[in-house]
């Protein structure tokens, strides 16, 4: 979870979360990618969007796979089409799930800007990893 305040006091932590601006809340809506997607895309986590397919890891709907139908920035919750229950009237109610309790198994890649951002992040990670591998202890570097 991103750091919104340096205080360890619960009241200040709660206030920082409830008063957080939308661009900070977007970072709170980040979920990890599946191992296959991590290898394929070269990144570990990404903010959840409508249309992504997720696997629920915790709670009553554990093991359920479905598409994200809604992302609630105010409550920092996502709604998955397969995580719902029926009211006595027959109306379906979607259950709110925290994004940290899901793993993204399939990305919605219809947005070109999102794909470009993923590529940019992957290239930056590869460049950073390449810099680390330049001098190793076996090559005469200090350990």
UniProtKB/Swiss-Prot annotation:
Keywords: Ribonucleoprotein, Ribosomal protein, RNA-binding, rRNA-binding. GO terms for biological process: translation. Disulfide bonds: none annotated. This is Large ribosomal subunit protein uL24. SUPFAM superfamilies: Translation proteins SH3-like domain. Coiled coil: none annotated. One of two assembly initiator proteins, it binds directly to the 5'-end of the 23S rRNA, where it nucleates assembly of the 50S subunit. InterPro entries: KOW, Rib_uL2_dom2, Ribosomal_uL24_CS, Ribosomal_uL24_euk/arc, Ribosomal_uL24_KOW, Translation_prot_SH3-like_sf. Belongs to the universal ribosomal protein uL24 family. It comes from Caldivirga maquilingensis (strain ATCC 700844 / DSM 13496 / JCM 10307 / IC-167). One of its GO terms (molecular function) is rRNA binding. Residues 11-21 have a biased composition (Basic residues). It holds the Pfam family KOW. Residues 1-10 have a biased composition (Polar residues). Residues 1-21 are annotated as: Disordered. GO terms for cellular component: large ribosomal subunit. SMART domains: KOW (SM00739). Part of the 50S ribosomal subunit. Gene3D superfamilies: 2.30.30.30.
């Amino acid at each position: 979870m991103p750091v919104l305040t340096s205080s360890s006091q619960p009241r200040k932590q709660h206030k920082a979360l409830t008063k957080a601006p939308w661009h900070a809340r977007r970072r709170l809506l980040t979920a990890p990618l599946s191992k296959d997607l991590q290898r394929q895309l070269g990144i570990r986590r990404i903010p959840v969007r409508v249309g992504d397919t997720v696997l629920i890891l915790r709670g009553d709907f554990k093991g359920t796979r479905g598409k994200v139908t809604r992302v609630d920035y105010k409550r920092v919750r996502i709604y998955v089409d397969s995580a719902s229950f029926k009211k006595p009237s027959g109306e379906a109610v979607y259950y709110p799930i925290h994004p940290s309790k899901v793993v993204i198994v399939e990305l919605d890649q219809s947005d070109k800007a999102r794909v470009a951002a993923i590529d940019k992040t992957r290239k930056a990670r590869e460049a950073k990893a390449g810099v680390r591998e330049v001098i190793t202890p076996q090559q005469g570097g200090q350990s």
